[in-house]
Design a protein with these regions (language model features):
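RecB-family 4Fe-4S metal-dependent nuclease core
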Residues: 1-302
Length: 302
């Protein structure tokens, strides 16, 4: 069920298209990638292992936090993980067994959570920013010591002290914080990044070997009113640029390592940028899958 926030103001001309973080971030990364992914609606036939594993963990945590009985929730969550995920060939880290181990130790470490869940996990939202609609999903809204927070689940294969730096100015948490404030009608203190790191058993344990509980970390991030205002402005500016590109059918390639090679893997559309839009390659390696966030959402008129 989608959470539709009814905040339309009189006189506003609201467009029906819903913009989200995935669309906007993709355009900022590379306009050509945006063209392939959101104009031509191409998706690689083979999805990345990290993405599949992270998605399965998200599904499991969604089941876990929806259940008031945590012990029962843990059993159902692990069953859900096994249902939606299978071990990819050649990956010895993101296996079903390691995923079950990861979730089991997560439930042990956070057996007694210091917060209560507000509403439902993975609730969808849509709210206006100027004349556009912005949408997404909230992983886990929580009440902690009388304060409202949004918790965002992340998985990583390398959890270091610098891991959280990437989220200090990231738009995604900022959008979640604003969305929760719009929905709740009260201040959201910030976004808690909840990180889970899968691990393989080591053959020789040393003093530096992580204990199971060390594979989980949380960090609260806050956003000033200035940053939230800047988010609103930037989202509208980026959407304006996207519309210009769509109107003029012009999408430049970024052609820089940060866009073409990231997280130790090639951009899924690299070969199309190298060799052109070859129909044979497209038919072989991609599927057409249109991205329409909240297609069935009904927006209330104010």
């Amino acid at each position: 069920m989608h959470l539709i926030i009814n905040k339309k103001r009189k006189g506003d001309e609201m467009e029906e298209r819903i913009w989200d973080n995935s669309t906007i971030s993709c355009f900022q990364t590379c306009r050509r990638k945006y063209y392939y992914q959101y104009v031509r609606h191409l998706r690689p036939k083979v999805k990345g292992t990290a993405l599949l594993f992270g998605s399965a963990v998200h599904d499991a945590l969604d089941v876990y936090y929806k259940n008031a009985d945590r012990e029962q929730g843990a059993v159902l969550a692990i069953a859900k993980f096994k249902e939606v995920y299978s071990t990819p060939e050649g990956d010895f880290l993101r296996t079903v067994e390691n995923g079950v181990k990861l979730l089991t130790h997560y439930f042990l470490k956070y057996k007694h959570e210091p917060f209560t869940v507000v509403g439902k996990p993975e609730e969808g939202f849509v709210f206006p920013i100027g004349s556009i609609l912005y949408g997404g999903r909230l992983d886990l809204p929580v009440e902690w010591d009388g304060q409202l927070w949004i918790m965002e689940h992340k998985t990583t294969s390398r959890l270091t002290s610098s891991y959280f730096n990437q989220y200090e100015l990231d738009k995604q948490p900022t959008g979640y914080i604003i969305a929760l404030e719009e929905f709740a009608g009260r201040k959201c203190s910030g976004c808690i990044i909840n990180v889970l790191e899968p691990w393989k058993e080591v053959k020789r344990v040393t003093a530096k070997t992580k204990q199971p509980g060390d594979h989980f970390l949380r960090k609260p991030l806050t956003r000033s009113e200035e940053l939230k205002d800047r988010f609103r402005y930037n989202v509208q500016a980026i959407v304006r640029d996207i519309k210009w590109c769509e109107e003029h059918d012009e999408y430049q390639e970024a052609e820089k390592k940060e866009a073409c090679f990231y997280y130790n893997r090639n951009c899924p559309f690299m070969q199309l940028c190298q060799y052109g839009e070859n129909d044979r390659i497209i038919k072989r390696d991609y599927v057409v899958e249109k991205w329409i966030p909240f297609e069935n959402a009904m927006r209330k008129e104010g």
